[in-house]
Amino acid sequence: MLMALPVCGPAQSTERRIERTVERIAESAARMAERVSERVSRAFDEWDRADDERLQNQDFVSRIDTTIAFSANGTVDLSTISGEIRVTGWSRNEARIQAYSERGDLRFSASSSRIRIEARSRRGRMGETRYELSVPQGSRLIVQSTSGDVTARDVNGPVDLHTTSGDIALHGATGSIEISTTSGDIEASRLRGDIEVDAVSGEFDVTDAEGTIRVETVSSDIVLRNLRVREATASTVSGEILYEGAVIRDGHYDFRSHSGNVTVRIPANSSARFQFETYSGELDSDFPITLMPGERSRSRPRRFEFNIGSGEARIVTETFSGDIMLERSGTSR
């Protein structure tokens, strides 16, 4: 069912609404870019301040290849300027660390509960750097990288992955999950916990997640598939949003895009109160609906609400120049 809704409200009010929306988007994009950059660079700033005092007597090395006894509750902390990073979780109570740098700039320390690897450019050297780690499942993983791809599989513990320029792939994590990148794609699956993602550019795709999820991007499409979360928040300035998953009783789902379409694909037996707002878009619904006018004023002239089932969950969608699609799962379109 396709519904094109008439624009209402004075022209002056509409123009001011557009101006406020553009201002809000510009401010949001600037804040997001600054937040991601600060998060990635903070570790390096702290490292530089303490570098001479803490590591002045430690030699640089070009290669690490060792296996140590390591607790499943331990922390793996890796900070690097560049290089490909691969981390895999396994069932052993030990960690295998393999790292190589043509620049000879690796620093390594380890105990039974914490592993720390640091790498940085020195004396203008260039060259390849790579890391491969196998750690006990359940370990906490922290990665700070300026340039390079990060892949983590089956870690099944808390994860903090932050890059300035590089793709991130995360498959299997539990607990607190934080991901950020300034420029790079993010692909994730099998996540259980509280998930937070900040990105400026690049694509975001997550499959199979439980718990809560919050995603904020500037110029990215957001794809969320096979989710069973009680709370989902996704916002993007110039991308599209797809949410495909369950709607949990008393759950809250909020999806907002300025210039992209928003698609919500949920089971036919879902129970939710659906609220949508759009300026120049249309609503396309697989569900039979009866529109109930919501809050209507000069600043919000096109906001409507309706119930699916008994309306137990809350779904909010908002676009400025995009369409909103409400689809039944499994429906061929």
PLM feature spans:
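Intrinsically disordered, low-complexity terminal regions
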Residues: 1-333
